[in-house]
Amino acid sequence: MANMLEVKHINKTYKGQVSYQALKQISFSIEEGEFTAVMGPSGSGKTTLLNIISTIDRPDSGDILINGENPHRLKRTKLAHFRRKQLGFVFQDFNLLDTLTIGENIMLPLTLEKEAPSVMEEKLHGIAAKLGIENLLNKRTFEVSGGQRQRAAIARAVIHKPSLILADEPTGNLDSKATKDVMETLQSLNRDDHVTALMVTHDPVSASYCRRVIFIKDGELFNEIYRGENRQVFYEQILDVLSMLGGNANDLSSVRL
């Protein structure tokens, strides 16, 4: 399977009165169709890593390749087009526009690409049916629950079939039931449609839906583990690594999935 994302020797230092090296020689790759989580303590560098992959920030050295192309070498106009075509984003706070309906929010990537209205409607109803939100398309964002808003945000992220989905704490504002619904949505898109996704999360339950978890500590790769057939076993393995990282995993060890 070809690599959809390659992270090669990424370094990032934030300069100030006291310089801080956020990332140190980070390297890993994600295959096409893989669902991977990144975990680590606060300040470990995981958000910096996601920002660099998404081109919000730039590395001091090293390379990012997405579908074989380094977006950091593109000029502004081509970079904007690359982001619209190749990347899909899912945020903790949904980032839906209150002035638009749920359906209009989902279609935004297609609107920016000036797709024909008939094509947009067809794609909208296809993804809405897949995610079980067809009955929400004419509602405003304040009329639906947090979990429904996040499923709409996921629909927006995948409607244009990007190469890579980047999710930043997608369940951070959700209760346990909505978290389960959202993670099952992402898992089914990965399994059925071979969507490639990288998710930053602090939540071991959410991470247990992934095929692989990469752990970062103090800006460096600390460990990585792969899921087998049993999600409960994988969840407990995640807790074990978090314990080594100094987290509060013991508080969650009795959770059964």
Curated annotation (Swiss-Prot):
Gene induction: Transcriptionally regulated by YxdJ. Induced by the antibacterial protein LL-37, probably via YxdJ.
Keywords tagged on the record: ATP-binding, Nucleotide-binding, Transport
GO CC field: plasma membrane
Residue ranges of domain ABC transporter in the record: 5-243
SUPFAM superfamilies: P-loop containing nucleoside triphosphate hydrolases
Molecular function as annotated in GO: ATP binding; ATP hydrolysis activity; transmembrane transporter activity
Residue positions binding ATP: 40-47
An individual GO BP term: transmembrane transport
SMART domains: AAA
Functional summary from the UniProt entry: Part of the ABC transporter complex YxdLM which could be involved in peptide resistance. Responsible for energy coupling to the transport system.
Subunit and interaction comment: The complex is composed of two ATP-binding proteins (YxdL) and two transmembrane proteins (YxdM).
Name of the protein in its database record: ABC transporter ATP-binding protein YxdL
Originating organism: Bacillus subtilis (strain 168)
